[in-house]
Each structure stands twice: as C-alpha cells, then as structure tokens.
Amino acid sequence: SVTSVLEESLNGARGLLYFESTNNSTGTAEIVVTFEPGTDPDLAQVDVQNRLKKAEARMPQAVLTQGLQVEQTSAGFLLIYALSYKEGAQRSDTTALGDYAARNINNELRRLPGVGKLQFFSSEAAMRVWIDPQKLVGFGLSIDDVSNAIRGQNVQVPAGAFGSAPGSSAQELTATLAVKGTLDDPQEFGQVVLRANQDGSLVRLADVARLELGKESYNISSRLNGTPTVGGAIQLSPGANAIQTATLVKQRLAELSAFFPEDMQYSVPYDTSRFVDVAIEKVIHTLIEAMVLVFLVMFLFLQNVRYTLIPSIVVPVCLLGTLMVMYLLGFSVNMMTMFGMVLAIGILVDDAIVVVENVERIMAEEGISPAEATVKAMKQVSGAIVGITLVLSAVFLPLAFMAGSVGVIYQQFSVSLAVSILFSGFLALTFTPALCATLLKPIPEGHHEKRGFFGAFNRGFARVTERYSLLNSKLVARAGRFMLVYAGLVAMLGYFYLRLPEAFVPAEDLGYMVVDVQLPPGASRVRTDATGEELERFLKSREAVASVFLISGFSFSGQGDNAALAFPTFKDWSERGAEQSAAAEIAALNEHFALPDDGTVMAVSPPPINGLGNSGGFALRLMDRSGVGREALLQARDTLLGEIQTNPKFLYAMMEGLAEAPQLRLLIDREKARALGVSFETISGTLSAAFGSEVINDFTNAGRQQRVVIQAEQGNRMTPESVLELYVPNAAGNLVPLSAFVSVKWEEGPVQLVRYNGYPSIRIVGDAAPGFSTGEAMAEMERLAAQLPAGIGYEWTGLSYQEKVSAGQATSLFALAILVVFLLLVALYESWSIPLSVMLIVPIGAIGAVLAVMVSGMSNDVYFKVGLITIIGLSAKNAILIVEFAKELWEQGHSLRDAAIEAARLRFRPIIMTSMAFILGVIPLALASGAGAASQRAIGTGVIGGMLSATFLGVLFVPICFVWLLSLLRSKPAPIEQAASAGE
C-alpha cells in the first residue's frame, strides 16, 4: 500500500525509463528508479524528492517516523573491501570488526567523489538486551515493562545551571549541573530497575535478560576464503568514472590502514575496475602493435625509410590532436575511445599514404624534384582527400545521436574517430606535402626496377597490376552481366544479415563470476552456511580461483536466511588458459552443483556492462497487467519456466527473488482480546520486540551514539509454541498469555513482493545455451510469453531493454549513415550519378563483414554494428579513389570505359597499400586474448572481413558500377574547358 502510493507519484518524472519496487516481509521496501542515459542525476533526485514529498500526506505515521531516503547510485558493485583479523590474532569475533569499519572506514569512503552508496555486509555495535520471557512471567513483568524502564532510565538529562540569569546582582558564580542519565556498558544497563517490591527488593534488568555489546543486526554475515570477515560494497554515483573512483577508494583504504589496530588488515577481494584497467592496457598494446604493422606495410610498398617516416609522423600528431579535443569535450580514455584510436591508425595513414605514394610515383615516372612532384601530386589527389575525409568523418556522425545506453557507447567512439579523421585530412593537405617537399630526395626514373627483394616485389606487384587491368577491361566490357552478379551478392548479403544472431554486447571474461545460492524457502542460516562452506571448498579446489568473498543472508534476489551470494575472483588473465576461462569455470561449477544436496547453487556471468543488471544473459519482468491476481501470476511463472527447461535455446532460466516461504499465521480473536483488556497495539509491540527486534533508544559507546536493541533470547523464539507462551499486559496490569486469544496455522506466503512500473511482477533471468545468442533466446522467450493466459504481460529490463532499443535503431542507423555519405558526395561532386556509383560498393564491403562474423560464430551486436559503419566509410573511400580519377580522365576526353580502367590501374597500388595497412592494423584486435578480448574480436573480425571484400572485390566492381551506372543514366562529361578552369 505504501509503495503503490509512491509509485503513483513517480509517474511522469522527466527522463524516467522504468521503476521497480521490492517489498520485504521484514517491513522494508525499496524502489529503484532508472532514468535515460544523459539525465542530470542531481535534477532527477530533486524531482523524485519533490514527488515523494507530495505523497507523504498519504503515508502511515510509522513510515514518516522512519523517513524516506533517496540516493543516487548506479546498479552493481564497483568493488568490495574486506576487513579481517590477521593470521594468529587473539580475537575472532566479527562484532569488533564491524564496529571498527562502521566508525572509521565506511564514512571515509562514502565521502569520496564518485561513491554513490556503500552497502555494508555487517553492522556496528549495539547494546543487545536478550530477554528471557519465562523469567519475565516469573516476576510478573512484560516486554513493555522492560522497554519502558530502559527508556525512562537511559536518558540525556539537561539539568541546567545554578546562578544563571535572571538572578541576584550579587551572584558571582555560575556552573552547569551534570547528571549522568545515560548508561554506558552492560553492567550499568543490568542495574536498570524494572520494579521495586513492597519489601524493598528490586527486580533489575539483569534478573530477566542477558546483556552484551553485540551487533545491531545479525541478518548478514560474510567470509573471505572461509575466514569470518566484514565487508562493504561500493556502488558508483551516476556518471562517475569507475577507474578514478576505484583508485580513490583503494588509496583511502591504504591511508586508513596506517591507523588500524595491529591485529586487523584489509583487502579488496572483488574489483571490477581491474578488468577495465587491464583491458585498456591490452588495447594500448594493440595500438602499438597496429602502428608497427602499419609501418611495415608502408615500408614494403614505399621501400624507403624517409617515405615511411612521413605517415609515421602524421599519425601521432593526429592522435595528439584527437586527445586534445577529447579532453575539451570531457571524454575519458575508455574501451570505446581506445577502439576508435586503433581503427584510426589504419585510417589515419591512408591520406598520408595517398599523398606520399603519388609523389613517389611521379618522381619515379618523370624524374622531377620532390617539390615539383609534390605540387603536381597534390593537384591530382586533393579532391580525393577532401572527399575521403568528409565521407569517413560524416559516416560516424549518426552514431553520436543514438539514444539509450548504446548511444553512450557509440558517442565517444564516433566522435574520437571522426575528429582523428578530420585531423588526418587537414594534415594531408598541409603538413604531409610540406614533409614530402623537405624530407624526400629525388629519385631516378625507373626506381621501381631496382634489384633485390624490393625489386622482385615491385615487378611482382606490377604484373599483378597489369593482370588486374586486363581483367578489369574484360569485366567492364560485360558490365551489365556482372551487375547481375552484383545483385546476387546484395541478395546474399540480405539473406545472411537477417540470419545473424542478435546480441547487445559479447560476453566477456571479466575476471570474476557471481554465484547465487538459494536454499528452500524457510531454510535456516545454519543450512545456508553449510551450503556456502561446500561452495567454498569446491572453489578452493579450482586452480583458476584466487579468492572467494561469500555473503550469507544477502543476494541480488533479496535478503533472507536462505540466501547467499559469492564473488569468486579469478587469477590474472595471463595466468589462465582457455580451459580456465570464466565461461569454463561457470560451466564447471554449475555441473558440480547440478544436483545439490540442499537448495540451488547457480554461477552466472556478470553483466558485460557494469550497472545494467546483476548478471549477463537476459532479464524479463512477468507482469499482472489486468489484475488477475498473484495466484495466476505464479501459475504463469511456473508454466513459462517449465517450457524453458525443455527448450534447447536456453542454458537456464529462473526466478530472481525469494520464493513463497512457510509462514506461521497468527489468528487473533480480537473480541476475546478486547474482553481481556488487551489492546492490539500491545500485541503487535510484544511480538515485534520478541521475534523481531525493537530499538529502544541510544547509548554512548566510546564517543559514538549507538542503539539499544531488545529481543527474546534465542532459545525462546525457535518454535511455534514459543509464540503462544508469550504474555502481554492488559489494561488492569495483569499478564495474559497469547494462547488465550491467539491460534496459529501454517501456510505459504510471499516474503517478497515485486512491482514493475506499478504492476505486480515476477523477475525472471536466464541465459542462452551455447550456440545461441541472447537475441535468439529473447525472441524465443517472447514467443513463449505470448502463449500465456490473457492479462499476463511482460517487459524487458536492464541489459535486455537496451538490447531491444539497440536492435530497433540498427536499420535507421545504417540508413542514416548511407544517406549522410550519399548527400555529402552529391554536394561534393554536384552530381547524382557519381555518388551513386560510389555507394553501390558499400554492400560489397558489408558482405565480407557479415560472412566473417557468421563464420566465426559471432553475433550481430553493438561492436559489429560499429564495424559495419566503419566499412561503409572505408568502402566508399576506396571507390572515391578510383571514381575521382575516372571522373577527371573522363572530363579530359577519355571514353567512359577507358577512364574507369585507367583510373583503377593508377589507384590500384595506393588502394592495396592503404587497405593492407588498415587490415594489418586491425589484426591485433581480431586476434586479441585476455581482458576485453571478446569486444576486440567482435569489432576486429567484422572490420577485417569487410575490408578484405571491399578491397579485393571492390577494385573489380567499382569500374563496373561506374561504367554501368553512368552509361545507364547517359551522363555526359563536363566540357574540357570547364574541367580545366575548375582545375585552375
């Protein structure tokens, strides 16, 4: 009832994507509100707080007393710190650990920039009053008497002062009155007087209760590698930098450790930033490898260190300029910006290679000076460079305007790549010609006829070029027939693309896994701990596992005695082979616990993008959209999960949450209670204090205000009979047993109620079986969910929601990229036919990318789409190099066919050189291993496949498309005089 009121107030919040509320049987509730990426978190928090403020008028007083807390934080844990005793320490009780962490560590970490929330897996100390109900009855006392006595005798006393104004003018001294009203330790609390008897004897608290300095809450405990510990999980604030925040947290922990007691130590057993650190380091290595390979390709073709040096100088200058712009835009060095840099290496050298190769060719053919050759070369290639630069930078612009989380992924990649390409084009028109004119030396005619390895290479390449030119002349002569082949390739592209399995991002080996432990409903903590110990023993036997942090009483599904969550962290990627990958370890654990002795133990891969869900795979919310009731919703859940169990497309699927559990229903005869003079408020207060716990007030412990908590002693709350043995006071002050007006019965009931976007719902999570993508599993899930009874609906959430958004945007993304490139070429060439002949080559590159990904068993994910957009630009680039020259030759009076064949021959060498440089620059991505390897391979494989087809098929089809299209449209060249004046 409370959360439904709050949910109503949240509807209409600006930037709201979805919200989910979780109501627990313990009386707590949480609403997680998710906003669109890019929403200002501070404004969103203020908006939510204002909406909740308006709803407070409809809140019960108990809720207002406890208060509503609003926090802004990202989902998922960034890291977990653990505080434990050193080996050989005298102490072993975790109460002191939890209290020390609460006093000296947690708040220090909460204050750090980037920390949104700290989830503490323990509690600070409290004065625990363990009541013996039987002793209370023996003294004729009730739990209310205990509560009232503590409240009355543990108080702050502001006694005032003597001699203070107004007073006598002769008063010369004032002083405050100090009265010790608060109690400080178990001995003092034990002296609290519950009753004074007529004979002068006293009944004290110590007579009916055991007092100790214990934990405020015993609901959650944790272990590190089997050793009791306390820990805290850090969650990022929205928009915070994970690496920076993790570094600050670890630095602060190191500083605080200097003040730890001698027998305490800390560790960070779980750290998601480690993957990002290592992955970025791997990409930097890939960047260096790409530069070396590109240098070797350039040296192979240019065969002179000076020639090779020029593009090698241009690349760092471009990257430096790109980093400067990224800094000004507030971008960070992350996986996507680094991917952009790696792809840029091969693209950046293109413009410089085109200039240098043309200068070198002119000097070799005509024997003129470097300065003269540079001037002549720039007249020939300036138009092509401008076209290539504009096309390659423009093709990435649509990526920057994508919505959702995928837009965030695309934005930094596209902007960093587009900026670097613009710098490359600018330098190719200014800096590169200057370097050519000053660094290059004159070379004699016939330079390519030298002896040795390079001479053999040049002669071999010349023969290939001549054969290519001969083949081109034959193909162009039959352009119409080969356009039918082209149409077949386009049809093949559409066929294979539609059969690519859909996914959002590839599953990564993040260096850890998540293990969810769920025992049967109603299972005790003892049973949960036993299963946890069995899990720890298994993980200890695995060579790949470095450490295990286990939390009992807590899971992403909810809190309860039958729940636990483990975070096994693996050794470094360099120390593990393929047989010890995260996927292999997850499979081994799930196989070992396939038939557990007690409950279920399920290992899942973490989400590849931290903050989008608790695990990889898919996440669905089954919803009661028509008020059919909880029973119908549960039946739909069982039907759906039953269908999935026998479906080969699913590895697993399960309900994420706490299942229905045994409940002891107390049937209170209110008429009897009223007749006996017992109020319902007294009944509820006694029950919650005895079987739950009740916070009475605070006491001062070592300078910190901590709570006084009362609860029945453990042995007096273990059985159903102990409920009926409780006594409550009536209006006359006499004790009445609950059994006089209460009966009990067993039933099953929910311990957790979940609502999604205001509808009763059930969380269902799962993953695709090997050989199937998450997109295929989600499509199958939608098919099965559509067969459920009327009134039952579903919605995707987390990573799955973003995957659906991404899939819906793909078509418009590609169409917009092609349209932008086409319109740019139309404006550049002031023609419709020439841009069309360039754009016809795009499918030729795309088919190579699709086939490469399909043969590799990969999916149509975000990284593949990034690669495909890149191929659109690069395919157009190769076509522009040929079409630009063909257009000039055609305008000079050559026939359409001769112009196309000659342009293809002249541009064959730079196209092969630039394409090979790009392909070799991307090979380290396609062959990546270790942290981030899946993402690198996903982007590298498609790009290499696309570039191979765009190069080796493209050089054949560009002349064909050019001749066929211009012949079909009967275009005429511009007059020679006009072309000449345009050249001037």
Where are these regions (language model features)?
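Membrane-proximal extracytoplasmic
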Residues: 1-291, 301, 408, 574, ...
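Extracytoplasmic/periplasmic
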Residues: 1-58, 62-65, 95-123, 144, ...
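Transmembrane helices with small-residue packing motifs
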Residues: 16-17, 53-62, 327, 331, ...
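N-terminal membrane-entry
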Residues: 224, 277-293, 415, 805-820, ...
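Hydrophobic transmembrane alpha-helices and their membrane-interface caps
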Residues: 265, 292-301, 305-361, 401, ...
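Helix-loop junctions and hydrophobic alpha-helical segments within the transmembrane domains
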Residues: 269, 276, 280, 284, ...
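Transmembrane alpha-helices and their membrane-interface boundaries in multi-pass membrane transporters
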Residues: 345-359, 381-401, 408-454, 566, ...
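Signature of alpha-helical transmembrane segments and their immediate interfacial
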Residues: 381, 452-504, 905
